[in-house]
């Protein structure tokens, strides 16, 4: 019984810190001097800095970043929503993810809506 309760607590503690941010994509861009991918908006997120197309950053390779960039361009041009997954204790607010700063806690996505 105690082991079942422990497992249940672990699942709840992991789930309590996970969240998603979803929405339309607008203004996909690359900062010319740094290679940083920025987006004017991804749903509620304003000007998040996601990754670098020319070097690894926070475990994201340039190749993976180019796929992220391509997915965001596809979402922007088709008007489809995307979803990003996070595993920190924040939310999708501007207070949690200030404009022009690197996204924290982002671990999966963008996933293009069907």
Each predicted region: which residue ranges?
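N-terminal signal peptide c-region/cleavage motif recognized by signal peptidases
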Residues: 13-15
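Sec-dependent signal peptide recognition
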Residues: 2-8
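Exposed beta-strand/loop interface patches that mediate assembly or binding
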Residues: 19-114
């Amino acid at each position: 019984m105690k082991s079942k309760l422990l497992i249940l607590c672990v699942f709840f503690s992991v789930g309590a810190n996970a969240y998603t941010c979803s929405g339309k994509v607008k203004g996909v861009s690359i900062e010319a001097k740094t290679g940083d991918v920025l987006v004017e908006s991804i749903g509620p997120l304003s000007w998040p800095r996601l990754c670098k197309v020319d070097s690894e950053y926070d475990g994201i390779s340039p190749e993976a970043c180019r796929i992220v960039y391509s997915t965001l361009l596809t979402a922007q041009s088709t008007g489809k929503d995307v979803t990003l997954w996070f595993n920190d204790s924040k939310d999708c607010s501007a207070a949690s993810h200030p404009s022009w700063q690197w996204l924290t806690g982002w671990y999966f996505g963008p996933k293009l809506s069907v």
